From Swiss-Prot:
UniProt GO cellular component terms: centrosome; ciliary basal body; cytoplasm; MKS complex; nucleus
PROSITE patterns on file: C2_B9
Main function: Component of the tectonic-like complex, a complex localized at the transition zone of primary cilia and acting as a barrier that prevents diffusion of transmembrane proteins between the cilia and plasma membranes.
Entry keywords, A to Z: Cell projection, Cilium, Cilium biogenesis/degradation, Cytoplasm, Cytoskeleton, Nucleus
Domain annotation C2 B9-type: ranges: 2-118
The protein's name in its UniProt record: B9 domain-containing protein 2
Subcellular localization, as worded in the UniProt entry: Cytoplasm, Cytoskeleton, Cilium basal body; Cytoplasm, Cytoskeleton, Cilium axoneme; Nucleus
Family that this chain belongs to: Belongs to the B9D family.
PANTHER family in UniProt: B9 DOMAIN-CONTAINING, B9 DOMAIN-CONTAINING PROTEIN 2
Biological process terms in GO annotation: cilium assembly
Length: 175
């Protein structure tokens, strides 16, 4: 089977109005993909930007996949959360990006968004925290479900991923 190695890091995030940010991440693939090593999901530590608005995470990603075809190429889905001084967490943004399909090192910028909710929910978010969240995480990368949502943009998550492709020519898989 053809193999894909994804090695890199979630470097951090910029452009969020909240501070004390952390990121929950996961990888989604099609049925023809098998994870040989690594973990499908994880979470960074909380970072409060000291200078500027960059939250630094430097969270490692190391995945090794085997596949029979290109359909269902891996996608990273991200959830950025903020934590207040009482330890309460609220959503700062959802985002996703496709893992690049060419070998080498890639710098990716993943824009994020969050559901707006009604004016009452927005008012409650401003004073109490919380706010609307998605019931199903599939809506993050499924455009068919996402177009009905009223959203606002969040910040940007910065990633650095290196890809190694192996045995694609041997198994007749063309990138």
């Amino acid at each position: 089977m053809a193999e894909v190695h994804v090695i890199g890091q979630i470097m951090g995030a910029t452009g969020f109005s909240e501070s004390s940010l952390f990121c929950k991440w996961g990888v989604h693939t099609g049925a023809a993909w098998k994870l040989l090593s690594g973990v499908r999901e994880g979470q960074t530590q909380v970072d409060t930007p000291q200078i500027g608005d960059m939250a630094y995470w430097s969270h490692p990603i190391d995945l090794h996949f085997a596949t029979k075809g290109l359909q269902g190429w891996p996608r990273l889905h991200l959830q950025v959360w903020s934590q207040d001084s009482f330890g309460r967490c609220q959503l700062a943004g959802y985002g996703f990006c496709h893992v690049p399909s060419s070998p080498g090192t890639h710098q990716l910028d993943c824009p994020t968004w969050r559901p707006l909710g009604s004016w009452r929910e927005q008012l409650a978010r401003a004073f109490v925290g919380g706010g609307p969240q998605l019931l199903h995480g599939d809506a993050i990368y499924s455009g068919a479900d996402r177009y009905r949502l009223h959203t606002t943009s969040g910040g940007t998550v910065h990633l650095e991923l290196s890809l190694l492709l192996r045995h694609f020519d041997r198994y007749g898989v063309e990138c």
